[in-house]
């Protein structure tokens, strides 16, 4: 038997407004890529998003990632329209996000791994 382990990963998307095109999304993704953020600019239907895997969410979590996307997007004349947490995050990661930003960032206690484990018991 072989068992592998990795640190937690948070899948997170920033959807851009209707003015944004795929070139904008790809430019933003390239600009924010780092050892902590894997990012792609994607076309989903008729909208574009910056799709991210936050591989060190205790260093760069949804709050920091969305801020980076917003800064680069604004320089290109587009805006982040909404944010999307894909799956769950840990309470440790959630605790680093200011309470007043959580709704905008699509995060809440009921979207944590710990909450889901608790309600199953």
Language-model features, listed with the residues they occupy:
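Long, contiguous binding/interaction regions
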Residues: 1-121
């Amino acid at each position: 038997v072989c068992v592998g382990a990795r640190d937690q990963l948070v899948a997170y998307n920033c959807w851009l407004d209707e003015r944004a095109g795929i070139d904008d999304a790809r430019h933003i993704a390239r600009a924010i890529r780092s050892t902590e953020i894997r990012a792609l600019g994607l076309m989903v239907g008729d909208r574009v998003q910056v799709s991210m895997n936050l591989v060190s969410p205790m260093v760069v979590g949804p709050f920091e990632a969305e801020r980076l996307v917003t800064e680069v997007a604004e320089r290109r004349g587009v805006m982040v329209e909404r944010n999307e947490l894909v799956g769950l995050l840990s309470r440790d990661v959630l605790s680093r996000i200011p309470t007043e930003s959580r709704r905008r960032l699509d995060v809440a206690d009921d979207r944590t791994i710990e909450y889901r484990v608790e309600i199953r018991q």
